[in-house]
Structure formats: structure tokens, C-alpha cells
Amino acid sequence: MKELYPGDQGIWVQYLQLALQRAGQQVMLDGIFGPKTCAAVEEVLGSSGKCAVKEAQWNRLLPFLRGYITHEVKAGDTFFPIAKMYDTTMERVMHANPGTDAGALQIGSTVVVPLNFPLVSGEVPYTSLLTGWIIEGLQARYPYLQVGTIGRSVMGTPLWSLQLGNGPVEVGYNASFHANESITTPVLLKFAERLLEAYADERMYEELYPERLFEEYSLYLVPLVNPDGVDLVNGLLTEGFYYRRAVRIASGFPDIPFPDGWKANIQGVDLNLQFPAGWDMAKKIKFEQGYNRPAPRDYVGQTPLSA
């Protein structure tokens, strides 16, 4: 976690501000660590005169980004007072702890407590970091959500997959093939969140009953296909070998703004042009346009499925 101080700017500050908002503070998500953000940090963390956000402070704020906290059961605890203690609902606590006898909790055991706000935000840029927090939070809130990976990115980031349902008909959805189109990631995650919530509440979602949907279909969601590229565009990746190489690649295409115009993966290959179908035609077209080498966009790669 990055240490933050007054005067800092960027994506990390926006995530700090999102956590503070969810903790009840009135701060803008402007990515500027100014006086109001400083005051909110002091209010939430009880650290008057100390605005620095280091590892210990992040650990206290992370539940507001992951959307849940864990509670160690004490004598006399039941779901209702636990929910009240964390200003959430008993229904949320019950959904996160299936099979647990709410009236006979074991002292010393752990209860997952979802906090009382929607987990998927549409107000901040997405990165591999935020996506990972959200997926962790969704699985904590809805333990029947199946989470896995389909591989790793060039930089080693997990390519997460979510499975909703166990039906015979398999359907796949994905998001953020292009690095500067990361708005698709929260769209897909919000779809998953709303569908899981409707299933837990035993109510309809968009004129469908999720229980029936999950019996007939297996939905596979890959919410962040290009995490390295997204991290570059949205300001999480700002240094190191891969960043410097991206800068060198971009320097050969001065008409494409950097990093905002970057669509490719971190190696300069456009993942959306990596499919075997029509690859030779795409290669001919893009090479004629000058994208015949690693580029911020439109380079098809050396062969299909090679990136």
C-alpha cells in the first residue's frame, strides 16, 4: 500500500477518499489530498494532527473498500447486535454466514459482517487493485460466488474469473480488453453484484428469478482482461521496467496521447485483435496504417493468441 501525505494526488488518494466517504465523511473524490481530506482522515482514524496514511491506517480503512469486516464472537453475541454494532443489517450478516446458527454462535469463532453500502462504485477509476478488493468483498458477502483465475497477466496479476450458477448452458462475459475502456469493468461487476443480491433476497432481477437462472446457466465473468494496461492508463502504474518500456513504445507514436490513448496490453499488443478469426485481414489493415510493431493501440501481435 502506498503511503500518502497532504499534497499527494492521484488514484491512491481517490481510493482513500472513497473509503472515507463510506465511513461517513463528506469528501470529494477528486484525488487531491487537501485540507478536507486531511480532516476526514483525522475524524475517522482519531489521529488529530496526523494526516499521514501508512500501512496501519490503510488496514483500518480497507474494510470500506472491500465492503466487509470480520467480527470475533463474544459471549452473548447474536447476528442482530453484531449487525447493529457495525451499522449494517442482519440480513446482510445472514447472507454472508450461511449455515451458521444465529442464536448459538461459538465464542471465539469469526463472523463475516458486510458493511451497509453497495460494493461496486461507479465514481472512481478502476485498477487491478480495486477490482481485487471488490471481488474479495463479493465473495465474502455471497459465499456461493465461485472465484478463480484463468491465468496471469504479463506483470503477474491474476486474471480473475467469477462463476454464477451451475447450469448446463455456459455463457461468458468479459470486460476491459482495451486499457482505456475500463468503464466496462464496473458495469460487469455491478451486474454480478445486483444479480447476487437478488438471489440472496429471493427476488426478481430484471424480470428474471436468479435461482432459476443459476439452475439453467453457468455465467462466467472475467471483469479485467487487461489489468496491466488498465493500471497504466488509470495511474496505478507510474514507474518501473514495464512503465518505462510503455513510455518508449508510446514515444514512437506521438499522435496518441499517453497514457490516455493506450489501448494495448503492457507489451504493446492490442488484445482485441488477437483472435484467430480475421487475424490475417486485421494484420494487413493495421500494418498498412503503420501499426506494424508494438504500439499503444492496433498492433495485432506476431501471431494470434500470442499475447
Task: Show which residues each predicted segment covers.
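Primarily a LysM-type cell-wall glycan-binding module
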Residues: 1-18, 28-35, 63-87, 109, ...
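Conserved hydrophobic/aromatic packing and binding residues within compact polymer-binding modules
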Residues: 17, 41, 93
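Intrinsically disordered, low-complexity Ser/Thr-rich linker and spacer segments
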Residues: 47-50, 55-72, 113-126
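Short, well-ordered surface patches within globular domains
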Residues: 35-38, 55
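Active-site/substrate-binding loop(s) of hydrolase catalytic cores
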Residues: 168, 182-186, 190-307
